[in-house]
Amino acid sequence: MDSVKKSWCIVLAVCLLAGLAGCAEHQEMPTETQAVITTEETTAPTATSAETEATEVTEATVVTEPVILEEPEPVAEYISEGVLITLDGVDVTEQLAEADYDRAIPIYSSQKLTIESETPFAALYIIWKNHPGIFTLQWDGGSLECGAEGFLHDYIQLPEVVRSVSFAFESEEDYAVMQLGAYTYGTAPEGVQDWLPPCETADILAFPTHSDDDVLFFGGVISYYAIEEELTVQTAFMTDHRYEPFRNHERLNGLWEMGVRHYPIVGTARDFYTMSLQEAANYHGYDPILEWQVQQIRRFKPLVIIGHDPEGEYGHGQHQLNTYCLVQAVEMAADARDYPWIALQYGLWDTPKLYLHLYEENPIIFDVNTVLINDPAGRTPYEIAQDAYVCHVSQAGYFEVSQNPNSVMDCTRFGLYRTLVGYDTGGDLMEHTARGE
């Protein structure tokens, strides 16, 4: 009996072990990933709705769209070979290769000026002797009207790449070209002036009398604010040098060197040397100058205006007349009773600050000897003004840029003639103004 019981016990044990083994064979073991998920699902607390929203926000901020960086526009290259310029079929390529301010090729409205190039081009650089009228560039399948701005130095980007362009002149006035060149597609290279139109509103509006006064007296100030602070500097010249057209080119070259990019405004007063304010007033009159100045002030709405020494620096009567009228024009520009027809076009403007060169009250000494970070050549405002004056070839030997405190040519000394925003505490002409806005 005992042996039978033992046998049954052995059989039952074997069966039990076999069953357990079978169960083990059919049970699927979780993978490592499944094990982790299972653990998280069993241990993590249930998220609230707020936590869910926060998670969604976090996830949304992490997911970003790919950023596509636009390649900068290339710098255009001058095409020096394989170019042919003809005027009514006559080759004038060599004459127009480089500007000579003492000569130009006259062109009548009935004539045809054409530029062709073996290398496709997308821009033209033109230097005119005098301000041109309207003209049209024409090529196979397209055209572009130009000349509305009247730029003497004009960089024109074409809407497509071409190999040949002809000029069609709109007016009966005579044209005269000093330089014409073709360029590949891109922004204007160094040495090519791509002027912007006169600005909408100016941070600084300077009122020099002649071409070169902007450099001699205001050059350090203009260079600093135009280059280092990248402010909008607009210039308005009282005289037009109608009998010395080369000085108009010198003016553009000097302004460009000082970092000015908005095309200058030029008045209609003739350049005429006078020895006193009264002599200048007898020649020009007061009202034409006042009206012109009020127009510029209301148009450009400057934060700061810069004018000549009331004594005319070295006694030039036109300098004196310019400033004598300017201090009145600043007041008139804010008064609706003065020149109301100009107010209808531009509105009124009360200029926050007016500085005059060498004015002794509320004096300021402007720093022209600090190297400008934004100047590629690492120059100071004084050095830039000196380089700009080199552009005034016709005036070489007469004057020079100076910071001699005992000289009437000193470009560092100014006085705050009028202010609506308080007096200066440092050497910054733009102090207390909303510069760059």
Model regions and ranges:
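N-terminal, intrinsically disordered, polar/charged segments of Gram-positive cell-envelope systems
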Residues: 26-72
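Active-site beta-strand->loop->alpha-helix modules in alpha/beta enzyme cores, enriched
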Residues: 79-87, 91-113, 119-123, 128-134, ...
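Hydrophobic helical h-region of N-terminal Sec-dependent signal peptides
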Residues: 12-17
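N-terminal intrinsically disordered, low-complexity tails enriched in polar/charged
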Residues: 4, 66-82
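Long, contiguous interaction/targeting segments characteristic
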Residues: 63-69, 234-236, 397, 401-404, ...
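C-terminal motif of bacterial Sec signal peptides marking the signal peptidase cleavage site
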Residues: 19-22
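Bacterial N-terminal signal peptides that target proteins for export
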Residues: 1-10
